[in-house]
C-alpha cells in the first residue's frame, strides 16, 4: 500500500488502522537470485517526510474488514452474478444469473479484470497472455526464521524470474510472490491451485532466503495465475454507469499499483459526487480526472514486467533503473488532485 493510496485511506478515517495493523518497511532490498548478494537498497524511511504518509504492507483481507468496520455492510448482497445492465433515463437496471433484478440511480462497476460491465459498455479486445506467471503463498511466520519478519521487503532476481517476500499482519504471516515465464496459459484468476514441486523447480539453486520461503509454503496453499495484458480504455463512463479499479485499468503487478490505483479511483470518485450537480456530471468529472493517471500506471506496470524479467541482476547495482521513485508515482494525492 504505497503513499498515494494510503493518503486516500487516511482521508476515509483509516489512519489509525494502518498505523496499528499494517507493517511499515524500512527498506526495499534487491538481491542476486543465486548468491543472495545485496545489489540495491531503497530507503522507505523517508516516505512520511516526503509524502506525508507511509509505505505500508498489509493483508488484503484485513483492509477489507477495516473498511466494513468503518462504513458497515449496508444492504450489500453477496454471491450475485451480474449478466446484464441497461440504462433508462435516470435509472440503471441490473439483471442477475439467478433471475433476480435490481434498479439503482448509479452503477459503479468494480467487478474486476474480467469485468462484465466493461464488456457490455465497450467493445474491448480479448486479453493477451503476457508470457508471465505469478505464484503466491502465505507462510505462518513461525515456520521461518526471524530474518523473514524484519521491517523489509526482499526481492531476489535472475533473468526470467524473481521472488518477493515481506511480512504482513504484524509478524504473523509472510507473503511470498514469485514471477516466472511461461509459453502459454489459459486461466486468468487468483485461485488456481498449483503444485509446490513445480514452483520449486523454477528456483533450483537460488539463495537460501528464497528457497526457505518457497519450501515453507503449505503444500495445499500454493496458487498461480497467468498475467494478461489489456490496453488502456479511452472512456470509463457512459451515462450513469462507470468502471472502477481493475475493471477500468487491469495492470500487471510489477509496480505494485493495482490496489493502490483502485483506492485512488474511489477517493476521487467520492469527491466528484460531492462536486457535481448530477450523477452523469460526477462520472464525467471522474473519468476526466482519472484516465490519464491510471493509463500511465497501467502502461508502466505492463512494461515493467518485461524490463524486470529481462534484467541482469547486476544492472540494479550498476545502471540507472526505472521504478516507482524515478516515475514519481507516490507523489500523486487523490485527496487534493485537481478535478
Residue ranges and their predicted role:
Residues 108-109, 113, 135, 165, ...:
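Conserved mid-domain beta->alpha element of the FAD-binding
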Residues 2-140, 183-187, 192-200, 337-339:
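Conserved N-terminal helical subregion
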Residues 16, 141-149, 171, 185, ...:
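Short helix-loop capping/hinge motifs at secondary-structure junctions, enriched
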Residues 31, 150-186, 192, 196-205, ...:
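Active-site substrate-recognition segment that forms the wall
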Residues 321-339:
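C-terminal auxiliary extensions adjacent to catalytic cores
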Amino acid at each position: 500500500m504505497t503513499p498515494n493510496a494510503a493518503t486516500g485511506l487516511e482521508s476515509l478515517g483509516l489512519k489509525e488502522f494502518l498505523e496499528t495493523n499494517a507493517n511499515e518497511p524500512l527498506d526495499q532490498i534487491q538481491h542476486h537470485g543465486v548468491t543472495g548478494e545485496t545489489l540495491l537498497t531503497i530507503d522507505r524511511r523517508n516516505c512520511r517526510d516526503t509524502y506525508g504518509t507511509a509505505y505500508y504492507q498489509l493483508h488484503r483481507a484485513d483492509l477489507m474488514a477495516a473498511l466494513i468496520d468503518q462504513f458497515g455492510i449496508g444492504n450489500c448482497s453477496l454471491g450475485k452474478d451480474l449478466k446484464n445492465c441497461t440504462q433508462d433515463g435516470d435509472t440503471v437496471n441490473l439483471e442477475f444469473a439467478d433471475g433476480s433484478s435490481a434498479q439503482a440511480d448509479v452503477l459503479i462497476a468494480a467487478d474486476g479484470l474480467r469485468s462484465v460491465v466493461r464488456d457490455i459498455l465497450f467493445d474491448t479486445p480479448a486479453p493477451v497472455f503476457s508470457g508471465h506467471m505469478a505464484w503466491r503463498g502465505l507462510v505462518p511466520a513461525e515456520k521461518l526464521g526471524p530474518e523473514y519478519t524484519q521491517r523489509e521487503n526482499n526481492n531476489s532476481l535472475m533473468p526470467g524470474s524473481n521472488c518477493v517476500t515481506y511480512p504482513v499482519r504484524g509478524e504473523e504471516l509472510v507473503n511470498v510472490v514469485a514471477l516466472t515465464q511461461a509459453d502459454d496459459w489459459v486461466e486468468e484468476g487468483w485461485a488456481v491451485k498449483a503444485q509446490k514441486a513445480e514452483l520449486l523447480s523454477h528456483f533450483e539453486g537460488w539463495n537460501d532466503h528464497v528457497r526457505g520461503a518457497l519450501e515453507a509454503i503449505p503444500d495445499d496453499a500454493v496458487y498461480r495465475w497467468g498475467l494478461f495484458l489489456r490496453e488502456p480504455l479511452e472512456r470509463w463512463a457512459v451515462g450513469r454507469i462507470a468502471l472502477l479499479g481493475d475493471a477500468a485499468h487491469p495492470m500487471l503487478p510489477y509496480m505494485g499499483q493495482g490496489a493502490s490505483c483502485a483506492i485512488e479511483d474511489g477517493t476521487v470518485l467520492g469527491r466528484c459526487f460531492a462536486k457535481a450537480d448530477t450523477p452523469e456530471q460526477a462520472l464525467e468529472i471522474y473519468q476526466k480526472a482519472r484516465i490519464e493517471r491510471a493509463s500511465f500506471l497501467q502502461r508502466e506496470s505492463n512494461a515493467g514486467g518485461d524490463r524486470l524479467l529481462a534484467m541482469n541482476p547486476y544492472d540494479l547495482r550498476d545502471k540507472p533503473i526505472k521504478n516507482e521513485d524515478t516515475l514519481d508515482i507516490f507523489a500523486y494525492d487523490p485527496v487534493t488532485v485537481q478535478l
